[in-house]
Amino acid sequence: MFNPLSVAIGLRYLRAKRRNGFISFISMASILGIALGVTVLITTLAVMSGFQKEIRDRLLQMSAHATVSAQGAPMHDWQHAVALAMTDPRVAGAAPYIESEALLQGERHQPAMMRGIVPNQETKVSVLAQKLKVGSIDSLKPGEYNILLGKELALWLGVDVGDSVIVLLSQTQTTPVGTMPRMKRFTVSGLFEVGYNEIDRGLAVVNMEDMQKIMRMDGVTGVRLKLHDMDHAWDVASDLAVRLNGPYLVSDWTRENANLYSSLKMEKTVMGILLSLIIAMGAFNLVSSQVMLVTDKQADIAILRTLGLSPAGVMRVFMVQGSLIGIIGTLSGVIGGVVLTWNLERILKLIESTFNITLLPEDVYYITGLPTDMQFPDVVVITLMALAMSFIATLYPAWRAARIQPAEALRYE
């Protein structure tokens, strides 16, 4: 497409000093605009991807990859379901669970999800034992009515290890004074911290047998599965439900938090589209600078035409020159984006310590720190998009240059 002569002249125009200094300024602004857009876009998408990955990982530390639960009634033969699940080589662990919404009362009230577990089996499907800041998962012994609370939940309730909390379940019971919610006093035996505010403030864990007693329940809600490859969660859970041969409900990690993952993906897409406008502005500046360059080089174009360069050759010259500006801006932006992403958390900590401010409040953004996950496909797409915009921006100025008539251009020289 580009012959050596077009490339040589295009490179010469890129390095040459312009008679009009304003053209050089606009060309530099084009490079900076494209570079800034690429840098900001790479960094922002890396942060958005980092948030997605961090939230997903922290959720899955306490949540199952997949669940199989009984439909409309407790699952009674859960031991058989766990044993059957473990025969699947794709399953790393399986454990029974009971879940119910509850209202916890300490110095204050707070709704939370209450989960009943078997301690020695829970370690196969979650990292609860490793996330305990105080206490041990072995403290959840049947009949002792101990409870593990998220650190933020305990702080809100105003309780600590050794204190008591009253748990009110959504199930009701009939008493001499009327219908009352089921309630029981538990002793706080440990505090856990995952680093995800929704869990640290919204989950309480007790022994499964204790929960069965206060709920008058002789089965479990279902079985939780941890897999070697969580991308196969739905298939594995569906296969287990079929093998159990009953009316079971199947869910996996993508469906349990579908709204959250969808909103995060949408935010990343919208942010990418909006920030692409910065690159578009740089490309628009490139159009302006190239049009002015064509006007400035009319005499040169006329001489080239009289020496035998075709209109297509003239067009290629300015396409090469403009594309090189785009390439320089894009590569500068890619380098800047990669370097900024690698050092972003360090920069934010420096800003926070210098101005004594908190840029990312934990209670707002759910997680601590600023995670980044720079994905190669994102960088490739951004690079190709910037190069495409730059190339398209050269077409109109190059077409104008090709239309210049030598006689008209040299008339007033």
Swiss-Prot record:
Function summary: Part of an ATP-dependent transport system responsible for the release of lipoproteins targeted to the outer membrane from the inner membrane. Such a release is dependent of the sorting-signal (absence of an Asp at position 2 of the mature lipoprotein) and of LolA.
Protein's UniProt keywords contain Ribonucleoprotein: no
Compartment(s) where it occurs, according to its Swiss-Prot or TrEMBL record: Cell inner membrane
InterPro entries: ABC3_permease_C, Lipoprotein-release_system, LolCE_TM, MacB_PCD
Gene name tied to this protein: lolC
Gene source species: Xylella fastidiosa (strain Temecula1 / ATCC 700964)
Protein name: Lipoprotein-releasing system transmembrane protein LolC
PANTHER family listed in its UniProt record: LIPOPROTEIN-RELEASING SYSTEM TRANSMEMBRANE PROTEIN LOLE (PTHR30489:SF0)
Keywords of the record: Cell inner membrane, Cell membrane, Membrane, Transmembrane, Transmembrane helix, Transport
